[in-house]
């Protein structure tokens, strides 16, 4: 692990930060430095007799999935996910999403390297909650969500985190594939394209991984959950489209506020119908058991709005991942508008 190089990058970020109001970059740089400092080589942990057996089994699984990602999925072969870090908390980062009261378009924030993104990430939950409160006081819809993993796009050697190990095997492997995909193709300022590409790689990779492992039961469970998730996302995107039309209708603020409330009530009702069709599956109950606003729809649009278009390109290439990656890299060189018109709903 090149700790010196990582520290130099962080120190440069701190210098940049000294001129920024609120020092948001400071907390991000210090948070990343803390994660980097906690890294331990997985190979050493696996050879150490003091490593607890449950952790050892999870890390053995990660090591095998990581090797598969390079060999079978043509994903980057580097130091990412060859180390482990315990950050001592349930999430590594908390993201704040915000929208104007009468808009489904997310607020965007621009940073070095990542470009403009639809969230602000905080390594401290209270800081994220405070920022979301400030956005609400300015009239925005805002929500905070915990994040168990993220990608530094290859600028650091991303570790496997303790926050990831509570997932089932399929989710853990899928996240590795997703985050490594960000290192392969990433367009600064186009979160929708980036996340949809990584999601398609995650899906394709996980299908192949579970078949490789001979886990037919896990594969069927994952396919069922994916179908449910598609229906859940379609529900959110349909609500988003109705709200988008409402906000463009020219109605008075009072009328829009009332109809907005009705739309989120309709969303919750439609979820109860969907849940009944699922035979009572309650996996999304926690998502709905809160007051909802525009900001809660941001992730659905960001992560899934372009997925069908990108998935179609993978199918056009017969599932050949290197050819698919080449198509994606070519699209990455086009304008954002051209990509969106071709790929996104």
How should these model regions be labeled?
Residues 233-345:
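Pan-zinc metallopeptidase signature
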Residues 17-20:
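Bacterial Sec-type N-terminal signal peptides, specifically the leucine/valine-rich hydrophobic h-region
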Residues 65-229:
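Acidic/His-rich structured neighborhood in mature extracellular/periplasmic domains
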Residues 35, 48, 55-62, 121-128, ...:
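Solvent-exposed, acidic/flexible segments
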Residues 47-51, 60, 64-74, 181-185, ...:
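Sec-exported extracytoplasmic/periplasmic mature domains
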Residues 28-55:
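Post-signal peptide N-terminal segment of mature Sec-exported envelope proteins
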Residues 1-11:
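Bacterial N-terminal signal peptides that target proteins for export
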């Amino acid at each position: 692990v090149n700790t010196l190089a990582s520290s130099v990058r962080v120190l440069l970020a701190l210098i940049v930060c000294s001129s920024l109001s609120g020092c948001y970059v400071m907390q991000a740089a210090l948070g990343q430095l803390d994660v980097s400092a906690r890294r331990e080589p997985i190979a050493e942990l696996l050879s150490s007799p003091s490593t607890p057996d449950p952790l050892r089994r999870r890390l053995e699984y990660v090591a095998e999935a990581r090797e598969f990602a390079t060999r079978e999925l043509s994903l980057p072969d580097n130091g990412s996910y060859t180390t482990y870090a315990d950050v001592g908390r349930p999430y590594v980062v908390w993201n704040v999403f915000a929208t104007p009261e009468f808009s489904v378009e997310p607020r965007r924030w621009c940073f070095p390297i990542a470009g403009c993104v639809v969230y602000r990430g905080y390594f401290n939950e209270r800081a994220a909650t405070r920022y979301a409160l400030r956005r609400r006081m300015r009239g925005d819809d805002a929500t905070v969500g915990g994040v168990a993993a993220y990608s530094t796009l290859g600028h650091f050697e991303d570790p496997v985190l303790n926050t990831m190990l509570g997932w089932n095997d399929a989710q853990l492997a899928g996240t590795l594939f997703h985050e490594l995909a960000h290192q392969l193709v990433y367009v600064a300022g186009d979160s929708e394209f980036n996340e949809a590409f990584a999601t398609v790689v995650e899906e394709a990779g996980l299908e192949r991984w579970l078949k490789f492992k001979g886990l037919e039961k896990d594969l069927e469970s994952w396919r069922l959950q994916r179908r449910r998730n598609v229906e859940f996302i379609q529900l959110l995107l349909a609500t988003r489209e109705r709200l988008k039309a409402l906000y463009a209708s020219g109605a008075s603020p009072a009328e829009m506020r009332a109809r907005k409330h009705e739309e989120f009530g309709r969303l919750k009702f439609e979820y109860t119908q969907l849940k009944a069709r699922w035979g009572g599956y309650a996996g999304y109950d926690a998502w709905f058991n809160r007051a909802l606003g525009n900001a809660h729809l941001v992730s659905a649009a960001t992560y899934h709005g372009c997925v069908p278009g990108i998935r179609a390109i993978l199918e056009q290439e017969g599932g050949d991942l290197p050819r698919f990656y080449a198509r994606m890299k070519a699209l990455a060189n086009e304008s954002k508008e051209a990509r969106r018109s071709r790929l996104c709903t």
